[in-house]
A protein has these predicted regions:
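C-terminal cap of thioredoxin/glutaredoxin-like
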Residues: 1-6, 65-146
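Structural alpha/beta surface segment adjacent to cysteine/selenocysteine redox centers
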Residues: 1-78, 110, 140-141
Length: 146
């Protein structure tokens, strides 16, 4: 990010890919509700740390077992100091459900079938890969090579 985005050489666009059932959709909606209070990345990071610490690091699946039930998502917002009345109203309204569904469908149409998935100049890089692989793809795009 520092080397390419902050210098204006590249653009970073985050899109949700909520493919693991209802809880992943609610989590994406909740992140958008946090974004309405300028806390997207804090909320995003909280969710990823929570699921890692409480499930994946213990060898358990956190998928649709209540980890991202709406009550928990609301508690996380409170933990981060968000305006809970606004956040809860936003999440309960389903205000971002269509946007999350649209981003997920666009991802499917582009060939995404899991996360993380990253596109560099239209080329899909699937899975967690070393930074050097991203760097090579960005450098190739900047030099005009796909």
């Amino acid at each position: 990010i520092d080397k390419y985005v902050k210098t204006g050489k590249a653009r970073f666009v985050y899109r949700h890919f909520a493919f693991l059932g209802p809880e992943s959709g609610w989590a994406a909606e909740a992140a958008n509700c946090a974004n309405a209070q300028d806390k997207f990345w804090q909320y995003h990071d909280y969710l990823f740390n929570y699921i890692w610490d409480n499930y994946y690091a213990k060898g358990k699946s956190g998928e649709n077992v209540g980890a991202f039930a709406k009550d928990n998502l609301k508690k996380f917002a409170a933990d981060l100091g968000l305006d809970t009345a606004k956040f809860n109203s936003c999440l309960d309204s389903g205000k971002y459900a269509d946007a999350v569904a649209k981003e997920t469908e666009e991802g499917r149409q582009a060939g995404v079938n899991g996360t993380p998935a990253t596109f560099v100049n239209g080329r899909l890089i699937s899975g967690a890969v070393p930074f050097s692989q991203f760097e090579a793809a960005v450098e190739a795009a900047l030099s005009g090579n796909k």
